């Protein structure tokens, strides 16, 4: 089969039967005689969009088995197709047409999955409805044939033959590292992911992620490419460095989109895509625009205008977010399912305000100006010295700009060791990550005035995540050592080595007595920070933590 013409399969009329899977009850009609329509080749449902795209879905298991655009089949590698997880297995698959829309419905246990095509479009719209944990559904993967979009991006390991870690982090001969984890992007940073080349662009436009988990700053794999082929992902629930429980319900649409080499149309992006044409298709869990509401805030006071602010909504059923306007903090978050949500205001990625808001169908909940108490922002506290900024990220620290798209062993990384002198480019000199087996025991040198040295002070260390319960214990001038702090709740998976510092922000506080300080104002005080834990292994997989900020309060 090549392109949308000259097909060997014949068109057939679809008649709804009593055993049709969920989602087809609202569909009826006969396939059009024109190019747009569907057919059955005995093993697959074949859909011609009437544009330049023809695709096939297995009647047995719901896999996407062929994806032909302008005569080239892009789908599959290594004998594997495109599907939920690694394939659902035997499923009930049905098809129907309603006017200019064709819907394929896949039922597997409690899970429902849908493919929709619209006449004249080079797009496939997908939805996935997770009812519970009985069917594993962490992702949809679009597998792409090898050699079609060759590249050497951070998430492509085609040219990286040496395994560095866990069979998913690799090194090139020049010492640069590559991994499917190294997208370098938070969910809120991207609308689409894919490749372009040879006058063709192939993309997945993400959904609004309302049923995913982790919030706006979550980082996960988005795509990969190896010598075998490539993969584009829609994340349904990813456990890597995850901070939230799994949500259930219908997620979508996410869109497989072909272009002539450019980016996909912004009309497909989350927050802009309208799907009123899907309202009557009968998909399980579907809620149209009329059944959703909006939250609008007139402003946010108490902000530090040097930082971006994000407003998040979350409850066990759904999550949403939106950016606050830089000038006044105005925000508007639409397409929200009815319910009561925790509203969180983030300075950068640091939560500085929480409240509650209730959303109703077809309604707008308008909030008066949200006032962030000064004490909620640790950056407002008066400090003798401060390393980094209190923004919930390691930004500005040594190697921080590299670690979302490279392994710590990457040749481009500056040395992870080395001591720090306050007043001498201290933030850029301090490593963004500390590990028990790599750079534990880092020393920070600083001076105090006589008056400052005569008083006790609070030392704070903010972290953004930890691996294997790594947490900081401090010693001052080899005369005073803090207790070992209890480990805060953090994800249990790898994080620091696979492109993510995003766990649970936590601040450790240490009350340092006056007797610990040097009495000579001309001498340096020495702070030693050790990473302690009874877990972890060695090297970059020893217990570790990511730094947000360190300061000594006045």
What do these predicted ranges mean?
Residues 77-129, 139-141:
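Extended, loop-rich substrate-binding clefts of extracytoplasmic carbohydrate-active enzymes
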Residues 308-327:
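Short amphipathic beta-strand segments in non-cytosolic proteins
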Residues 349-368, 372-375:
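Structured interaction patches on ligand/partner-binding surfaces of diverse proteins
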């Amino acid at each position: 089969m090549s392109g949308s013409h000259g097909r060997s399969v014949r068109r057939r009329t679809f008649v709804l039967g009593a055993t049709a899977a969920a989602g087809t009850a609202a569909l009826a009609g006969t396939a059009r005689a024109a190019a747009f329509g569907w057919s059955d080749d005995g093993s697959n449902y074949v859909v011609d969009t009437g544009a330049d795209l023809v695709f096939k879905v297995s009647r047995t298991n719901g896999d996407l088995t062929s994806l032909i655009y302008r005569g080239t089949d892009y789908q599959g590698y290594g004998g594997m197709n495109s599907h939920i997880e690694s394939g659902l297995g035997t499923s009930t698959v049905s098809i129907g047409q309603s006017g200019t829309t064709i819907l394929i419905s896949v039922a597997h246990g409690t899970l429902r999955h849908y493919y929709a095509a619209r006449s004249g479009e080079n797009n496939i719209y997908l939805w996935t409805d997770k009812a519970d944990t009985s069917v594993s559904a962490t992702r949809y993967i679009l597998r792409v044939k090898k050699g079609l979009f060759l590249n050497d991006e951070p998430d492509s390991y085609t040219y990286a033959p040496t395994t560095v870690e866990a069979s998913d982090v690799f090194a090139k001969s020049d010492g640069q590292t590559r991994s499917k984890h190294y997208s370098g992007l938070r969910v809120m940073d991207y609308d689409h992911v894919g490749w372009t080349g040879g006058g063709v662009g192939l993309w997945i436009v993400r959904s609004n992620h309302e049923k995913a988990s982790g919030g706006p700053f979550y980082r996960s794999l988005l795509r990969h490419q190896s010598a075998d082929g490539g993969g584009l992902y829609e994340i349904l629930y990813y456990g890597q460095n995850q901070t939230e429980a799994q949500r259930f319900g219908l997620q979508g649409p996410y869109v497989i989109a072909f272009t002539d080499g450019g980016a996909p149309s912004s009309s497909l992006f989350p927050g802009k895509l309208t799907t009123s044409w899907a309202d009557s298709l009968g998909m399980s869990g579907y809620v149209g625009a009329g059944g959703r509401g909006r939250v609008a805030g007139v402003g946010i006071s108490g902000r530090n205008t040097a930082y971006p602010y994000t407003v998040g909504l979350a409850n066990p059923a759904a999550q949403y977010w939106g950016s606050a306007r830089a000038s006044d903090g105005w925000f508007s978050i639409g397409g929200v399912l009815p319910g009561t949500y925790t509203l969180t205001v983030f300075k950068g990625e640091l939560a500085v305000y929480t409240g509650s808001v209730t959303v109703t169908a077809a309604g707008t909940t308008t909030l008066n100006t949200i006032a962030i108490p000064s004490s909620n922002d640790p950056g407002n506290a008066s400090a003798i010295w401060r390393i980094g900024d209190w923004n919930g990220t390691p930004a500005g620290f040594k190697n921080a700009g590299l670690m979302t798209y490279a392994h710590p062993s990457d040749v481009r990384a500056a040395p992870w060791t080395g001591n720090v002198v306050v007043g001498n480019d201290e933030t850029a000199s301090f490593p963004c990550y500390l590990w028990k087996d790599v750079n534990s025991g880092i020393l920070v040198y600083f001076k105090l005035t006589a008056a400052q040295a005569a008083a006790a002070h609070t030392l704070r260390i903010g972290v953004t995540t930890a691996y294997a319960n790594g947490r900081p214990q401090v010693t001052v001038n080899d005369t005073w050592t803090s207790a070992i702090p209890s480990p805060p709740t953090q994800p249990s998976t790898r994080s620091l080595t696979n492109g993510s510092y995003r766990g649970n922000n936590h601040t450790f506080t240490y009350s340092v007595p006056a007797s610990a300080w040097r009495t000579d104002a001309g001498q340096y005080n020495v702070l030693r920070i050790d990473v302690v834990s009874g877990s972890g292994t060695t090297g970059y997989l020893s217990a570790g933590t990511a730094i947000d900020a360190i300061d000594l309060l006045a």
